[in-house]
């Protein structure tokens, strides 16, 4: 295939996706993807796992005529990389999550804003940033949302930069240039009174009020403002006294959607209080079933406890054993012993 791509590139210009299957197992991926990026096509429940031939499920699902056309239009994007143009297609979990989130967004915005769209919990390494990109594209192009503004909020500069890089590389798919906020003044100039459109990136700390114990100034009361928060499980997204309260002051009629790669307990009232209930769950178990994540094993080791007196005896024996050695050899051995010693637990005598 690589030889054909190199020698007859025109042969693949109209290719939408590649399928590899032996009937029982099937994988789908783009022409520029490595094999590790090929995935099965499933429902989010995984009910069909081990009960149906994967090829049959893929043909009846992804290759259903209406879904296939929609997938090509809305879930395929191109990014310019150093090695050339890369074609990216959505995994089934990204497709289902973005579709469900769009529907929930339309419902919440139609209720005059202040909506809790929900939470997308997709495990680490599952392509969360691309899921956000696909969803932003769907939201931006949806006519019923009247050219909305999407604000992507993170709590760290490095995370903000990573997400912005992904979105910026996908600007042709988004049909607009994303904007990264540099400081508080830039935030106000970009968002104050903004009438429509835009994909804006900012760290949440920029929404702090200018003076302590005061409110963040109103930037827009539009109802079609969508705030996407990454790592939404973190405590700063508290609507009462966290940063989410300042976001709410700035955009009182906005709708919130949270993304997280960390499990959220049902007792986590704050996260669901700000963002709403779960929209999509792609946990570690599902990722392992898709061979996207390697199994994680925990081998419990019970360490033998050593008393302080015993440790002192060992120290003395060590000094005696190394007495005739060169200083360099002794120091090297001491460093090794100190590392081992730090792993031992001591009990009181």
Please tell me what each predicted stretch does.
Residues 185-200:
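Conserved motor-coupling elements within RecA-like helicase/translocase cores
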Residues 20, 200-202, 255-260:
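Structural recognition of the conserved hydrophobic beta-strand(s) that form the central parallel beta-sheet
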Residues 199-228, 236-243:
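Conserved RecA-like ASCE ATPase "motif II neighborhood" in helicase/translocase motors
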Residues 1-149, 158, 162-173, 205, ...:
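ATP-dependent helicase/translocase motor core
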Residues 171-185:
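Conserved RecA-like helicase motor-core motifs
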Residues 231:
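Walker B catalytic acidic pair
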Residues 269-348:
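Interdomain helical connector at the RecA1-RecA2 junction of SF1/SF2 helicase-like NTPases
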Residues 124, 250-266:
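Conserved helicase ATPase motor motifs in RecA-like P-loop NTPase domains
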């Amino acid at each position: 295939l690589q030889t054909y791509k190199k020698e007859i590139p025109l042969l693949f210009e109209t290719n939408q996706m590649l399928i590899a299957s032996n009937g029982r197992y099937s994988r789908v991926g783009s022409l520029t993807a490595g094999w590790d990026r090929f995935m099965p096509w499933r429902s989010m429940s995984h009910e069909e796992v081990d009960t149906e031939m994967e090829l049959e499920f893929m043909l009846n699902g992804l290759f259903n005529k209406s879904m296939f056309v929609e997938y090509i239009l809305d879930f395929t994007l191109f990014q310019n990389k150093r090695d050339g143009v890369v074609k990216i297609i959505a995994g089934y979990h990204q497709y289902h999550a973005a579709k469900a989130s769009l529907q929930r967004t339309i419902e919440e915005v139609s209720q005059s804003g202040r909506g809790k769209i929900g939470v997308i919990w997709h495990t680490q390494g599952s392509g969360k940033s691309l899921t956000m990109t696909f969803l932003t594209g769907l939201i931006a192009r949806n006519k019923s949302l009247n050219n909305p503004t999407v604000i992507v909020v993170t709590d760290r500069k490095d995370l903000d930069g990573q997400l912005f890089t992904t979105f910026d590389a996908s600007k042709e798919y988004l049909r607009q240039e994303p904007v990264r906020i540099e400081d508080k003044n830039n935030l106000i100039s970009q968002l104050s009174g903004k009438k429509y459109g835009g994909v804006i990136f900012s760290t949440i700390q920029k929404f702090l009020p200018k003076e302590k114990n005061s409110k963040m100034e109103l930037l827009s009361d539009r109802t079609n403002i969508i705030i996407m928060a990454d790592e939404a499980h973190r405590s700063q997204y508290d609507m009462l006294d966290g940063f989410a309260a300042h976001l709410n002051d700035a955009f009182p009629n906005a709708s919130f959607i949270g993304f997280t790669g960390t499990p959220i307990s049902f007792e986590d009232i704050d996260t669901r209080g700000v963002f709403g209930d779960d929209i999509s769950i792609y946990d570690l178990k599902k990722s392992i079933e898709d061979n996207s994540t390697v199994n994680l094993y925990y081998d419990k080791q019970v360490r033998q406890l050593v008393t302080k007196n015993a440790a002192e005896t060992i120290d003395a024996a060590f000094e005696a054993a190394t007495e005739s050695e060169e200083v360099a050899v002794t120091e090297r051995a001491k460093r090794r012993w100190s590392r081992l010693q730090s792993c031992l637990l001591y009990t009181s005598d």
